[in-house]
Regions:
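Nucleic-acid endonuclease domains
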Residues: 1-40, 44-56, 62-164
C-alpha cells in the first residue's frame, strides 16, 4: 500500500494507532464520526462527555519524518505521533517492512502551531492548508513514550546504529 499511495499511508498508520488505543486504553474513538474523520479529536477520554476539554482529547498522528508534526487544524490537546520507517529489504527485522521506531506523546497548545499555508488555488492542484508544530525537535525532546534503541536519526532519517 505504501508504494501505491504514499500520501495516505501516514493516515492509515494513524488509524491503526487509534484503533489500538480504543481497544486497550482509557481513550475511545470519537463516536461523532464527522469530527473524528475530518477534524479533532480522534480519541476522547472515556466518560468525558460530548464536549471534552482539550485535556481529554487525543489525536493520533503518524509520520515518516523524525520530528515534524502536521495537522489541518491547530487544536489544543494531547497528540500521539507514531514514527515509522519503511524497510523494503526487511534488514532491520525479518518479515517487517513497516516498523514503528518511536512513539511521541505531547500536549500541544494552539500557540505551538504555525500556519504553513497552501499551494492549492484556482489555477490547479496543491495541498490544503496545514499547520506544523513550531520547533518540533525542541517540543518533542523527552516526549518519547517508546523508542527503539537499535536505531538513530542520521541525515534526517532513522537508520540502524551500526549503519555507515
Amino acid at each position: 500500500m505504501y508504494f501505491e499511495q504514499k500520501n495516505i499511508f501516514s493516515a492509515f498508520v494513524g488509524i491503526l494507532g487509534t484503533r489500538a488505543l480504543d481497544s486497550v486504553s482509557v481513550y475511545e474513538k470519537n463516536r461523532q464520526t464527522d469530527l473524528a474523520q475530518t477534524r479533532f479529536p480522534d480519541l476522547i477520554r472515556r466518560g468525558s462527555g460530548e464536549r471534552p476539554s482539550p485535556n481529554d482529547c487525543l489525536e493520533s498522528k503518524a509520520s515518516i519524518r523524525p520530528w515534524a508534526v502536521q495537522a489541518h487544524y491547530n487544536h489544543e490537546g494531547w497528540y500521539i505521533i507514531w514514527r515509522y520507517l519503511i524497510d523494503k529489504t526487511m534488514s532491520i527485522e525479518a518479515e517487517k517492512p513497516v516498523i514503528v521506531w518511536r512513539v511521541d506523546v505531547v500536549y500541544l497548545k494552539s500557540a505551538d502551531w504555525k500556519y504553513e499555508g497552501s499551494g492549492a488555488g484556482p489555477g490547479g492542484g496543491g495541498r490544503t492548508h496545514t499547520f506544523g508544530v513550531d520547533k518540533p525537535a525542541a517540543k518533542l525532546k523527552g516526549k518519547a513514550l517508546y523508542k527503539r534503541t537499535d536505531l538513530t536519526v542520521k541525515n534526517g532519517k532513522p537508520v540502524p546504529k551500526n549503519h555507515k
